[in-house]
């Protein structure tokens, strides 16, 4: 069974993330939604983010939600992931993720990265926008 790691801070996990995981679960054997701590961001409490993610994707079969505080490649090794899955909304996303892809390959040869474009209905959603809207009381 192929294990795919979908890593991120998911602050918060939104409908676009959930859609990506649902689609990946149909393609691959096992999906691990890896929720990261980050020394470069100030994400919300890890336990809260994990609980919210578990609730949001509870209906999806063969998906595990696991928190981690290491390099993504080290976590991929730990869970025996063969593939990293990333959602790509824009060319800017691709440029950044392409750099990460090459660094991950250098650190863990054989680790592949697969990009999925978002479903059209979620193509504009980002965690930053969700936090901004929530900050003003929007839903």
Residue ranges and their predicted role:
Residues 1-139:
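Nucleotidyltransferase catalytic core that binds NTPs
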């Amino acid at each position: 069974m192929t294990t795919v790691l979908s890593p991120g801070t998911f602050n918060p996990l939104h409908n676009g993330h959930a859609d990506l995981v649902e689609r990946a679960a149909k393609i691959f054997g096992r999906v691990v939604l890896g929720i990261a701590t980050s020394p470069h961001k100030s994400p919300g409490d890890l336990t809260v983010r994990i609980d919210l993610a578990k609730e949001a994707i509870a209906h999806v079969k063969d998906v595990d939600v696991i928190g981690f505080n290491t390099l993504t490649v080290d976590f991929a090794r730990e869970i025996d992931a063969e593939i990293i899955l990333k959602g790509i909304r824009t060319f800017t996303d691709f440029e950044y993720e392409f750099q990460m892809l090459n660094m991950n390959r250098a650190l863990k040869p054989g680790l592949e990265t697969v990009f999925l474009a978002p479903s059209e209905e979620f193509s504009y959603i980002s965690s930053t926008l969700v936090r901004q809207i929530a900050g003003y009381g929007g839903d």
